[in-house]
Regions:
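Extracellular glycan-modifying ectodomains
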Residues: 1-227
Length: 227
């Protein structure tokens, strides 16, 4: 079987795919096999482990200034890009093991999470799945859960909006395969696994990648052809 896997960070998924003008046309002037072959990327878990995490620039380059602001202001919005909140358990191996730093867009983009937008995204992927199915290709959609959304249940004082993206999307009828990364990684946090995300980064760590690849939800697709 052949598959196309589309991955998008959660906060950008609706911006990219919940559109009435989304162009699903597959060009006929290029060989489809060539297009997919040229766009393939191979991920090596060991190499991912050795990569240094990209640091949130404002938090890193202006550490002295922001630390002063942080101690004066306390938890909440640290600056224009970063929020800091206290967790009810240690989920990182850093010095601040129970502090969550997350990107402001994780909060800002929650305003797009309406049922109508999620239904439109699902509709577009169903249409794309039909197109690919006619060519003998199965579609997989794997949205990468935002850091705030994943760690939200553990924030002690939380006045922010709650995400409905994964919860509502999982209830809709699909012609494509949906990998629920929030569901997979939430189980890791329930077991108090640390550093699923890097403490000072917006992206998940090699541990998250490894856990997803080794999950039943992921392996059932390729080993058993199940969704």
């Amino acid at each position: 079987a052949r598959y196309v896997l589309i991955e998008s960070v959660q906060r950008e998924a609706l911006v990219r795919f919940a559109r009435n003008d989304l162009n699903l046309a597959i060009k006929t002037d290029k060989n489809l096999e060539t297009i997919f072959r040229n766009s393939m990327e191979t991920y090596n878990i060991e190499k991912l482990h050795n990569l240094k995490p990209s640091i949130i620039n404002n938090l890193n380059l202006n550490a002295f200034i922001y630390n002063i602001k942080y101690y004066i202001k306390g938890y909440g919005k640290l600056n224009s890009s970063v929020y800091i909140e206290k967790l009810n358990k240690d989920l990182f191996t850093s010095k601040s093991s129970s502090k969550l730093a997350f990107y402001h867009e994780d909060i800002k983009k929650l305003s797009l999470e309406t049922k109508e937008n999620i239904e439109l995204l699902n509709h577009n992927f169903n249409n794309l799945a039909d197109i690919l199915e006619s060519k003998g290709i199965k579609l997989i959609f794997m949205p990468a859960v935002d850091k705030y959304n994943l760690y939200r249940p553990y924030i002690i004082s939380n006045n922010y909006i709650e995400s409905i993206f994964f919860e509502y999307l999982s209830t809709l009828d699909k012609k494509y395969i949906f990998i629920n990364t929030k569901e997979i990684l939430s189980k890791n946090l329930e077991n108090s696994e640390k550093d699923i995300f890097y403490a000072d980064d917006t992206h998940w760590s090699y541990k998250a990648s490894n856990n997803i690849i080794e999950s039943d939800a992921f392996n059932n697709i390729f080993n058993k052809g199940e969704q």
